[in-house]
């Protein structure tokens, strides 16, 4: 099976080198539910109003060519309770059988990985599959009302394991997994890696954490109510929502 250790140096550099993605092509057809261009908006703002740089356009980009398919995965979130996970997946091609599984940060969604997914697939020439999903309380995943507010690390980890075991049932064809998490998702990725190691179930070949800032997050907790109150109640368009989030440096 494919291992990151076997990739050429040039490919490793290309995968992790910072670069500006090219503009996406806009498609006329709808992609699943109303394009799924952005998922849910982030749940907090940073409060600053001066942008680092003004982009030429705030027009939303299409995610049409970023993943091969959109999925709805039915999981057991408790022994007697089902939930539906919205996921986006591009399977690995050829002899490779490794999938990068992405968990987003708090207030974000699976499609925050859309451009990265497209580029990783292209740069690895399809050797790496990529899966991203909306965790509970985010995006288009649906959980029962008495379950969805439980955002504990244990519950998020249990959800991630359930997604993996459901989508990749035990067999010789089960892929090896690279777990990738941004912010809150980084903690989930690490905890999931430990849990899978104890279970000796799914093979994890790597863990990637992006922007892990627990100390800063804890320091901001007393100010979070003020930050949330500064958010607009709504936006007249997706473009205006993007503009506000960029100018306040939320994204």
Question: Where do the language-model regions lie?
Answer:
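Flexible "cap/lid" loop of the alpha/beta hydrolase fold
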Residues: 190-194, 198-239
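Conserved HGGG/HGGXW glycine-rich cap/lid loop of the alpha/beta-hydrolase fold
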Residues: 83-143
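Gly/Ala-rich beta-loop-alpha elbow adjacent to hydrolase catalytic centers
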Residues: 181-185, 189
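Core-facing hydrophobic residues within beta-strands of well-ordered domains
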Residues: 127, 174, 202-204
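Active-site loop/oxyanion-hole signature of alpha/beta-hydrolase fold enzymes
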Residues: 63-67, 73-81, 91-94, 132-180, ...
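An N-terminal hydrophobic leader/cap segment in hydrolases
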Residues: 2-75, 88
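Structural motif
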Residues: 98-99, 176-178, 206
């Amino acid at each position: 099976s494919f291992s990151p250790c076997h990739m050429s140096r040039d490919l490793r550099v290309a995968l992790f080198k910072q670069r500006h993605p090219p503009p996406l092509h806009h498609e006329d057809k709808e992609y699943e539910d109303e394009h799924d261009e952005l998922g849910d908006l982030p749940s907090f703002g940073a409060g600053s109003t001066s942008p680092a740089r003004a982009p030429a356009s705030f027009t939303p980009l299409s995610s049409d060519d970023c993943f091969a398919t959109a999925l709805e995965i039915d999981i057991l979130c408790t022994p007697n309770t089902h939930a539906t996970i919205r996921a986006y997946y591009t399977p690995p091609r050829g002899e490779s059988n490794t999938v990068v599984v992405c968990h987003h940060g708090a207030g974000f969604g699976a499609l925050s990985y859309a451009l990265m997914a497209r580029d990783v697939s292209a740069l690895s020439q399809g050797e790496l599959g990529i899966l991203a999903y909306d965790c509970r309380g985010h995006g288009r995943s649906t959980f029962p009302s008495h379950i969805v507010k439980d955002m504990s690390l244990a519950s998020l980890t249990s959800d991630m394991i359930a997604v993996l075991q459901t989508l990749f049932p035990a067999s010789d064809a089960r892929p090896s997994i690279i777990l990738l998490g941004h912010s809150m998702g980084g903690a989930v990725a690490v905890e999931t890696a430990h849990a899978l190691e104890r279970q000796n179930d799914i093979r994890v070949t790597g863990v990637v954490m992006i922007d892990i800032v627990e100390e800063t997050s804890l320091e901001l907790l007393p100010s979070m109510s003020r930050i949330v109150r500064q958010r607009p109640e709504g936006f007249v368009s997706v473009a205006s929502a993007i503009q506000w989030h960029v100018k306040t440096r939320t994204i």
